[in-house]
């Protein structure tokens, strides 16, 4: 993903304020509620039958944090997202058989959650930079599929 120096500092500055547990749980929860077909990858998570069940589910929160911990690692390696996410791409492709479109959906949901949590601080310029990052991460995660 090509980010200018200014875009890199913009995304890094905001990311430094992100509570990965809180934001991760909300992002994964929203993905599961807004795109319910994604729930099939989380059969072991128990009750995902309603929005309140999803958002109250400890496994959703825990996995959301895990997802954002990986995303945080990617934020440290914006110039090498394919290399950073190579093993996760392989896992999601070969073992979990996740539709790569879901990575794009999760990235867009993450942008919504960041906007919701950071309000006025999440300017159109910040959003534009984050859209590039989540698109780059989605492409890197889908890399093994090609």
Curated annotation (Swiss-Prot):
Pfam families: Globin. One of its GO terms (biological process) is hydrogen peroxide catabolic process. SUPFAM superfamilies: Globin-like (SSF46458). Keywords: Acetylation, Heme, Iron, Metal-binding, Oxygen transport, Phosphoprotein, S-nitrosylation, Transport. The modification Phosphoserine is found at residue 44. The modification N-acetylvaline is found at residue 1. GO terms for molecular function: haptoglobin binding; heme binding; hemoglobin alpha binding; metal ion binding; organic acid binding; oxygen binding; oxygen carrier activity; peroxidase activity. Heme b binds at residues 63, 92. PANTHER family: HEMOGLOBIN FAMILY MEMBER, HEMOGLOBIN SUBUNIT BETA. Belongs to the globin family. Heterotetramer of two alpha chains and two beta chains. Involved in oxygen transport from the lung to the various peripheral tissues. This is Hemoglobin subunit beta.
